[in-house]
């Protein structure tokens, strides 16, 4: 994930076309405003997610909560840097904070990009194991804990983001008094080979940070949807409404991720390849101008997840209500009652066939036939 507006200088490469660059002036005010909005919503929402996860006892935490908490930490780590980038953009890409903050804030952006998508992938794989391969899931949990898995994901994200810490620097913009925060490959490349590093790092970050994880997520949710559909085909008509709800949650997760990230990665990759393919001037300038807005869309994902939790996860809604009520018994009682009713209604559509826990001929069904409850379908 790159800071959006200063496209060329972010990668440390000049536009090799002879096109005359014309900026979309509206971005100078609009983009900083979006950054600050994401900062406010992201710090509040992700802080609330962390509070919700860690306020519950260890026994009540779901297997996916470690990934949810890790995702919130990644988003929170990123959004706290947004005031710096908002200032940078508002000052027409003049960096006043020094070289170290340029390196660190840029590094945290990339750590967030990798850590977030890896956590989402880990969460998707966790749901796949819990729903599609419950036996393998139980065996795997005996060997690898969620904490160990997320630690590995964070180490991998930190290593993949390291080139930014190495190559990011500040420098005076030619013929101006502005100081820019950009990628400088001079320590490893000549001026003529800068583009190779630019293209190599840009395409590899898109491949590792989007294409591969997104493919894994799609695969996991495909098998999850297939398993859920097979389960509900065995139920009566009243189960169809729950079936549609569960499948819609899966679609929302995948589509939201794609809508937030695909424009950014697509535009970035097209621009990187422009050094090789030599796009027409109009198209090249369009990519340069639209990229900051694609970046803003990807940034929105860092504050969007808490709203998805609030919409789809009854337990998260109950925790939020409890906090807003400040522990008042009347409000807490109402929230508890409402949550209980929703939970009962939600799980009944998953576990019941002709009667409560009854199979054909009135035979008692075993608990293992209920792997599709709210507990295993926790959303992203």
Curated annotation (Swiss-Prot):
Classification of source organism: Eukaryota, Metazoa, Chordata, Craniata, Vertebrata
Keyword Zinc-finger: no
Region of interest: Disordered: 342-380
Quaternary context: Homodimer; dimerization inhibits APLNR-mediated G protein and beta-arrestin signaling pathways compared to monomeric APLNR.
Protein's job: G protein-coupled receptor for peptide hormones apelin (APLN) and apelin receptor early endogenous ligand (APELA/ELA), that plays a role in the regulation of normal cardiovascular function and fluid homeostasis. When acting as apelin receptor, activates both G(i) protein pathway that inhibits adenylate cyclase activity, and the beta-arrestin pathway that promotes internalization of the receptor. APLNR/APJ also functions as mechanoreceptor that is activated by pathological stimuli in a G-protein-independent fashion to induce beta-arrestin signaling, hence eliciting cardiac hypertrophy.
SUPFAM superfamilies: Family A G protein-coupled receptor-like
Extracellular topological intervals: 1-30, 87-99, 165-198, 271-289
Source organism superkingdom: Eukaryota
GO CC entries: plasma membrane
Domain commentary: The hydrogen bond between Asn-46 and Asp-75 is crucial for beta-arrestin signaling induced by APLN/apelin-13.
Biased composition regions of type Polar residues, renumbered to the chain: 371-380
Provenance organism: Macaca mulatta
Name assigned to this protein: Apelin receptor
Membrane topology according to the record: Multi-pass membrane protein
Topological region Cytoplasmic: 55-64, 126-146, 224-246, 313-380
Biological process annotations from GO: apelin receptor signaling pathway; blood vessel development; coronary vasculature development; G protein-coupled receptor signaling pathway; gastrulation; heart development; negative regulation of cAMP-mediated signaling; positive regulation of angiogenesis
Annotated S-S bridges: 19-281, 102-181
Annotated site (Required for APELA and APLN/apelin-13 interaction and signaling): 85, 168
Subcellular location: Cell membrane
Keywords: Cell membrane, Developmental protein, Disulfide bond, G-protein coupled receptor, Gastrulation, Glycoprotein, Membrane, Receptor, Transducer, Transmembrane, Transmembrane helix
Bias-annotated ranges (Low complexity): 342-351
One Pfam short name: 7tm_1
